[in-house]
């Protein structure tokens, strides 16, 4: 999709120019995405004045624009941020239906109270710790059928067993 092409352009240009973009390049890429939804335009002078890192902002822009489209894992691998992003427990909101003292949901039909407020119990539960091994997980294993076709073909580090 066109939005992803603009994001790729911004990221590639940023990398090729030594971690720099001009305002014209930001306008051509990121701000075209923001303009279509009437969002505040990215301004390099504002980012600098606010002490914000352009690389972080470009990556955040990509994460938001492509949310739910299955690109996050490949992005994190390309940026070599696996340890940071995948080496910790998954956290996030967890909503549970509110129950009264009798163990029944007092608002079973709508989930809202008489004032129209959504009722839920806050949960601080976390998922289990995730495991990420930088010596292994940045590469995929070479498939066994390919190794059987060519016995001289080795295996990527960490996947030998």
Task: Say what each PLM segment does.
Residues 1-161:
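Acidic/polar-rich alpha-helix caps and helix-coil junctions
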């Amino acid at each position: 999709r066109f939005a992803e092409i603009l994001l790729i352009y911004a990221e590639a240009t940023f990398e090729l120019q030594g971690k720099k973009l001009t305002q014209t390049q930001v306008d051509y890429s990121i701000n075209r995405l923001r303009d279509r939804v009437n969002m505040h335009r990215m301004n390099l002078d504002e980012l600098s004045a606010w002490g914000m890192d352009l690389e972080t902002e470009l990556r955040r822009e990509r994460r938001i624009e492509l949310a739910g489209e299955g690109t996050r894992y490949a992005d994190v691998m390309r940026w070599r941020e696996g340890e940071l992003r995948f080496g910790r427990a998954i956290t996030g909101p967890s909503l549970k239906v509110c129950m009264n003292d009798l163990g029944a949901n007092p608002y079973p039909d709508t989930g809202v109270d008489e004032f129209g407020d959504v009722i839920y119990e806050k949960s601080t539960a976390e998922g289990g710790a995730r495991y990420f091994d930088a010596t292994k997980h940045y590469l995929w294993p070479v498939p066994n059928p390919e190794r059987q076709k060519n016995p001289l073909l080795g295996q990527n580090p960490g996947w030998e067993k």
